[in-house]
Amino acid sequence: MGAFECSCFMSKPFLFLTVLTVFFLSFSQVATPLPPHISCSPGEEALFNGHDLSEWQAQDMSYWSVVDGAIVGTAGEKKIKGNQFLWHEREVRDFHLSLAVRQVPFAANAGIQFRSQPRAGGSAFGYQADVGKGWWGTLYHEHGRGILAKSRVTGEEHLNQEGWNQYEILAMGPDIWLFLNGKISVALHDPEGERSGRIALQVHGGMPQRVEYKGLNLTENPTGGIAGSNQNALREFLQK
């Protein structure tokens, strides 16, 4: 099936204005450059149609369903046998992805794979935007290099423990940014990393849990720019 008409969880201009405003207020006193502003592109599309799992596959689909317009990963009251991944069928390179995530219990773990590939046995290899108590906003490399950058957004007061949290991933060449609830959590220059791959949703193995994902909106080859700064300042902001 082709791309679906996009239905954003939050209007893009409002979301990015909020991101830039909050970030500026937090860091302007120490002359920290602003994160990149990504324009709302006509090419934005929904990766999930809100009704079924068309264009998504998993080694074991019994863990995955659609409930009330969200993708749900769970085994009910049973423990989850190993990490489970639901893969979107296409590969992407440079992109901006926004989505909302809700997790019960809050102490559980999940994540969003990107620039990743499935491995034999059902595991994954590649970047992960982590989800879970003590892990939200962290950039992890699944079955590879481990933690690449810990979240700058610390403290549970920045998270909605009982509801939806907004996640954004921006990958442009070797540079990666993660945004959590409108605040930048990671900015990493990673020349060793993968430059393309697939997107997948994870429910972590172990304790019974339920993770929900909705509003998955993708823009490929987004337009990058700097609000109140320049390209040199952006590079200085990235972790080396």
Which residues does each PLM region occupy?
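Bacterial N-terminal signal peptides
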Residues: F16-S26
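Cysteine-centered motifs
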Residues: C6-C8
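Carbohydrate-interacting regions of secretory-pathway proteins
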Residues: Q29-K240
